[in-house]
Amino acid sequence: MLSLAAALAVDAVELKVNCERPDSWKIVTEKSVSGDVEEYEFRLSSPTAAVPPRFDVTFDVPQLDAHHKWTTQTEKVTMPPNWSCHTSSRLCASMPLVAFLNDNDRNRICVSASEAMRFVGFEAGLREEDCRIVWKVTFFSEPEAPLSAYSVKLRIDRRDVFFGDAIREGTEWIVRSAGLRPTVPPPAAFEPLYSAWYSFHQDVSDKAIEAECAEAAKLGMKVLIVDDGWQTDDNNRGYAYTGDWEMSKRRFPDMAAHVKKVHALGMKYMIWYGVPMMGLKAKNYERFKGKYLWTSNSRWSGYSCLDPRFPEVREYLISLYEKALREWDLDGLKLDFIDAIGFHGTDPAIGENYAGRDLKALPAAVDRLMKDVFARLKAIKPDVLIEFRQGYIGPAIRQYGNMMRAADCPGDLLANRARTANLRLTSGGTAVHADMLEWHRDERPEAAARYVLSTMFSTIQYSVMLRTYPESHKRMIAHWLKFSRDHRDALLHGSFRPHHYEAFYPWMEAENAAERIVGVYVGGTVVPVDAAAKPNYVLNGTGEGVVFVDSATAATAEVLDTFGAPAGSVSLAKGLNKVVLPVSGYLKVR
């Protein structure tokens, strides 16, 4: 590739723009600086509409007190070499932001791109020859429809600030630069819910769901999601029977009456759809032949991916969702597998000269589909709930949904904690949900509560078969549901700061004007408390019967166990204190 632009300074570092076709495309670069934040705008133009060229922006910076790479895609937090450091983003996968941090929660460099729709490749890793972090940000490396003009911005933030602030501000910069309008979530998006996935998998039925909801409602859960299985009599997993989206009459003989019974318990009702899926055994499969992006017939797939560039594909899907809301009186939908919409190699539309497609660019078609879905469902139910799953969690996705759930991590409290914390940093005001909680019924309630405490700074989804679990587990769940409700403003809407990404967040905190809540998850971690201005709560998610607190003042603390029952009190001296605290219990410091 040929260098198009003269070198631009990033401090003492050269920034270069490289383009595949500099003879037919002109690139103009503009730079603005505000303190330690630099912005670059790259404007491409061509005399006639043409497939845009692949181009990239490269630069490097010295590795100075930078030790860990932060992205939304990986939980590998070490310093990668520059020969194995690729991440990427597009509308329905990840987001165009990468950062490097030090060991003390400080930002060292955070780079974000304004391209929230198309594929963006990020390579950022250490060059071993000279200990420099080498960057390459690539655009138009996937098939793209012809155009004659394009612009994109790059933001390079090298401020010495809390890393979470750099990531949050980089995210909101993308929102502004791309002209995005995230939805405002209704209150129900923050309500704890029951998910039928881990507890039932596909083996769902009206009577069993109603019995579970009766238990869930008594404990304080307000929303239900019925996942895969409602649309088929088959229990063999995979997605061969998706696409028709007709209710299984064996499982749910009268869906509207069933939903009414769940509503009577005080719970809202949502169901799952695999958005682009047309199962190979679906009745409608032949109807849409020639309108698929790709087909997979493996054990865990068995479907073709619909191409939303066809208007009849979009209308088919939207009409299904509208019908479900109207006929069954649903309150929302879990719209899954949007990240499957993409190319597996070449774009099939190119060889067909885009025949039948009213939109040529795939990201534009996904955007159109999801905007129309949200607008038309909202017209039926203004407070409609729409859940999306990590990794389609970028700023553009927030325009179409109001619940962002951590990617599947059954039984993995560490991954759930890290994923929800990362989502809190990038999701703005959108409701962040934990992956569904499950644990063995023979687990001690104090040990089971660690799953709850690890996700306390998100909206929690439970997915255990409540009817078969001990009463002690239900008492524990009920208490923490009440705690999360009583402290929701601080936990979910207050200032949130997760600490030490390199250790998967051994402690996190959130606060509002009235209170501060600290969760500690690794034994031996010292957490600061300062109850002079407001009450502090310290939640013991370590699995050990002690916590270490560094108190700004002498104070008195109530000790409570995992059921919320008083377990004594303790006097804290100013400075370091070793406090005996029940596993999954908590301190209330005043």
Model regions and ranges:
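Active-site-proximal substrate-binding groove within the catalytic cores of carbohydrate-active enzymes
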Residues: 145-147, 151, 369-585
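An acidic-aromatic substrate-binding cleft motif
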Residues: 175-215, 219-223, 231-232
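Active-site-adjacent "subsite" loops/lids of carbohydrate-active enzymes
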Residues: 184, 191, 198-202, 268-327
